[in-house]
């Protein structure tokens, strides 16, 4: 299990990609691509737009409050435990399995926010990750060599337990 020490959490305040204020703005970027959502609101917005993420990673909360708007989930559902501020082996294994079970929702007991990092390694080049940036909007990042390098660098700030 990897744990992000509190003193390093500031590193994750900056978005990994381009921020959009409205979900409809990302539609041209995900058309015909494998895309994954991390977060309940982003996953809800995709499903409400009639789009089924290849992998949706949710925890039932947004801004630490229960999120009750989720439409009916499509595809397989995997349940994992991943405490806040961590990336567990269980989460990584579920994300890998989800790639074989598309479409799949990974339902996290704990917190899903950091799932973006392992997804950069698991997804193929050209896949797209969408996640929410509180008070800013929706972040879109395309998986490529540069994104993987950025994620790998951020992982050096974690402690292995």
Swiss-Prot record:
Coiled coil: none
Record-linked InterPro entries: GTP-dep_dephospho-CoA_kin (IPR007164)
A molecular-function term among this protein's GO annotations: GTP binding
Entry's EC annotation: 2.7.1.237
UniProt pathway annotation: Cofactor biosynthesis; coenzyme A biosynthesis
Positions contributing to GTP binding: 40-42, 59, 112, 135
Keywords: Coenzyme A biosynthesis, GTP-binding, Kinase, Nucleotide-binding, Transferase
Pfam families per record: DUF359
Taxonomic superkingdom: Archaea
Catalytic reaction list: 3'-dephospho-CoA + GTP = GDP + CoA + H(+)
GO biological process: coenzyme A biosynthetic process
Family: Belongs to the GTP-dependent DPCK family.
Described purpose of this protein according to its UniProt entry: Catalyzes the GTP-dependent phosphorylation of the 3'-hydroxyl group of dephosphocoenzyme A to form coenzyme A (CoA).
Stored PANTHER family: GTP-DEPENDENT DEPHOSPHO-COA KINASE, UPF0218 PROTEIN TK1697
Name of the protein described by the UniProt record: GTP-dependent dephospho-CoA kinase
